[in-house]
UniProtKB/Swiss-Prot annotation:
This is Protease HtpX homolog. The gene is htpX. Binds 1 zinc ion per subunit. The lineage of its organism: Bacteria, Bacillati, Bacillota, Bacilli, Lactobacillales. Its EC number is 3.4.24.-. It comes from Leuconostoc mesenteroides subsp. mesenteroides (strain ATCC 8293 / DSM 20343 / BCRC 11652 / CCM 1803 / JCM 6124 / NCDO 523 / NBRC 100496 / NCIMB 8023 / NCTC 12954 / NRRL B-1118 / 37Y). GO terms for cellular component: plasma membrane. Zn(2+) binds at residues 144, 148, 228.
Length: 297
């Protein structure tokens, strides 16, 4: 059953990533039209930028993501014995190599995994998580992260993060340049003889500038929700004790948001680190629903 869930999750994620690439191309077309009056140039530029972002993130994702989230690497068990040994044990059970281990200095309990593949992965936990979780709860959380590593969710998340960052960059460039630089020229061109097609393309381009970041967030949300349910099930399988993760999720659900977190990395965490802050899209399923699914296992 779990194998079937993993395969289904991979198929859905492939579809979502394909939609993501299409969105990058559409944003590129919009930026190209606004800045250069060329849809084709914009599409090519967007694909190149998206590819560069993806290559950079995939090849160096751990260092980039940990720097964005202020993670400090621990090199041996003496620095954080409980966390180190829990990661070591869960990696052994999941039959994946021991990942690099990081600690984030934040009182809010949370954790995430990142990397390119099980051979190049990392797990981070906040100081708040280590303070409030007992042994079985910590095992449940770390097993959840090991499931992300084992299922290659970390690579998918890295690619999605890179594409979302590329879309943000493109829309910022297009919006700022058009509105503050060439906007007057463009509007004058439209008034002085722009036909219906030009007006339609202009409206499309402006709408893309506004809606593309929201669409990117929605796709990230869908990818993240698929990952979280599957990783919860994987945690229960690895620990053979779903109650540990259930208890941990209850504590996570009552926690305050993290003080200093990179918003583009929010989908990586086991629990939404931006909770109680206004967000149009939530990258995580409701805690209550996750607990309900675990209790039925």
């Amino acid at each position: 059953m779990l194998y079937q869930q993993i395969q289904s999750n991979k198929r859905r994620t492939i579809v979502l990533l394909f939609v993501f690439f299409i969105l990058v191309a559409l944003v590129g077309a919009a930026v190209g039209y606004l800045l250069l009056n060329s849809l084709e140039t914009g599409v090519v530029a967007a694909i190149v930028i998206g590819a560069i972002y993806t290559i950079i993130m995939v090849s160096n994702s751990t260092n980039v993501v940990m720097a964005m989230n202020h993670g400090h690497e621990i090199k041996n068990a003496d620095q954080a014995p409980e966390l180190w040994h829990t990661v070591e044990d869960m990696a052994m059970v999941a039959q994946v190599p021991m990942p690099r281990v990081f600690i984030i200095d934040d009182d809010s309990p949370n954790a995430f995994a990142t990397g390119n593949n099980p051979e190049h992965s990392a797990v981070a936990a906040t100081t708040g998580l280590l303070k409030i979780m007992n042994r079985s709860e910590l095992e449940g959380v770390i097993a959840h992260e090991m499931s992300h590593v084992r299922n290659y969710d970390i690579r998918i998340s890295t690619i999605a993060l890179a594409l979302a960052a590329a879309i943000t960059l493109l829309t910022n460039i297009g919006g700022n340049w058009w509105f503050w630089g060439s906007g007057d020229r463009r509007r004058n061109d439209d008034r002085n003889g722009g036909g219906g097609l030009q007006i339609l393309l202009l409206v499309f381009s402006i709408l893309m500038m506004v809606l593309a970041p929201l669409a990117a967030a929605a796709i990230q949300m869908a990818i993240s929700r698929n990952r979280e349910y599957l990783a919860d099930a994987g945690s229960a399988e690895l620990t053979r004790n779903p109650q540990g993760l259930i208890s941990a999720l209850r504590k996570l659900g009552n926690a305050q948001p993290m003080k200093d977190v990179d918003s583009s990395s929010a989908a990586l965490y086991i629990s939404n680190p931006l909770k109680n802050k206004e967000r149009l899209f939530d990258t995580h399923p409701p805690i209550e629903e996750r607990i309900d699914r675990l209790e039925k296992m």
